[in-house]
């Protein structure tokens, strides 16, 4: 990594992208809060446990980088390339991730509290056990994404594509999944207490053992969904398509 960074320090004088002093700081230690590393090539870099709070990493190449346990709170990663990076246990609370690429990245137990991931393409990615509290995933592509045991309390997933996603035992209390497409998704044992599921497609979804207490299922499709052992006390049903195709209007006013 040192040879790569030395080359980049010489190149930076020509392009004026990142700060050479900040690059040197990153090379000599694990603390680089508020550093400007914009457009730097840090592919395959060993950055586990590094402190990059508030750092500028716009359009930075972090593909294949080892960022396990890294502190990236409030960092600007807009347009950054994180393909195949290892972010296991990393903290990205409040980070700016507009147009960041995560293809093949390892995201287990990552913390993304309050981040904005609208329209992000995260299809097939692994977020098992991740903290996604208050995250905005509206319109995001989450097809076949692994969200088992993820914490999605008050998360915004309006219009998200969750087809065949795995949300088994995920915590989705007070989450907004209105208009989401969750056809064939796995919500087994998930907690959807007080979740907004209006106009959501849950056709053929697995909701066995799920908690739907107080959830709003108005205009929702549950056609051929598995509701074995699910709890739905105080849930609202209005023009809801039940698993057998019958329309439930019990909660219409």
Describe each model-derived feature in a short phrase.
Residues 1, 17-18:
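Absolute protein N-terminus
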Residues 1-8:
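Sec-dependent signal peptide recognition
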Residues 8-9, 106:
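Residue-level detector of intrinsically disordered terminal segments
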Residues 12-14:
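N-terminal signal peptide c-region/cleavage motif recognized by signal peptidases
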Residues 18-253:
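Tandem repeat scaffolds
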């Amino acid at each position: 990594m040192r040879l790569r960074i030395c080359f980049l320090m010489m190149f930076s004088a020509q392009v004026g992208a990142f700060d050479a002093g900040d690059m040197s700081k990153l090379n000599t230690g694990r603390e680089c809060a508020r550093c400007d590393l914009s457009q730097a090539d840090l592919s395959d870099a060993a950055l586990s446990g590094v402190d990059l709070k508030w750092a500028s990493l716009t359009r930075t190449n972090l593909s294949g980088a080892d960022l396990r346990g890294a502190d990236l709170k409030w960092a600007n990663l807009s347009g950054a390339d994180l393909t195949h990076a290892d972010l296991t246990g990393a903290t990205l609370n409040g980070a700016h991730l507009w147009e960041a690429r995560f293809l093949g990245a390892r995201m287990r137990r990552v913390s993304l509290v309050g981040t904005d991931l609208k329209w992000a393409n995260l299809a097939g990615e692994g977020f098992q056990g991740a903290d996604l509290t208050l995250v905005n995933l509206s319109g995001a592509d989450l097809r076949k994404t692994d969200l088992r045991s993820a914490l999605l309390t008050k998360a915004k997933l309006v219009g998200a594509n969750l087809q065949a996603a795995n949300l088994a035992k995920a915590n989705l209390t007070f989450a907004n999944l209105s208009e989401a497409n969750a056809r064939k998704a796995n919500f087994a044992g998930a907690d959807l207490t007080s979740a907004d599921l209006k106009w959501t497609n849950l056709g053929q979804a697995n909701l066995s053992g799920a908690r739907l207490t107080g959830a709003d299922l108005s205009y929702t499709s549950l056609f051929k969904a598995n509701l074995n052992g699910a709890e739905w006390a105080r849930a609202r049903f209005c023009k809801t398509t039940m698993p057998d195709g019958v329309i439930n209007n019990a909660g219409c006013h």
